[in-house]
């Protein structure tokens, strides 16, 4: 997996976790 794709995946995953925490 290219570094940029991995970074984007990690960023989106982190955003999902953070937003899920805020929604709770």
UniProtKB/Swiss-Prot annotation:
This is Positive regulator of RepFIC repA1 expression. NCBIfam families: tap_IncFII_lead (TIGR03475). The gene is repL. Keywords: DNA replication, Leader peptide, Plasmid. The lineage of its organism: Bacteria, Pseudomonadati, Pseudomonadota, Gammaproteobacteria, Enterobacterales. Pfam families: RepA1_leader. InterPro entries: RepA1_leader_peptide_Tap (IPR012605). GO terms for biological process: DNA replication.
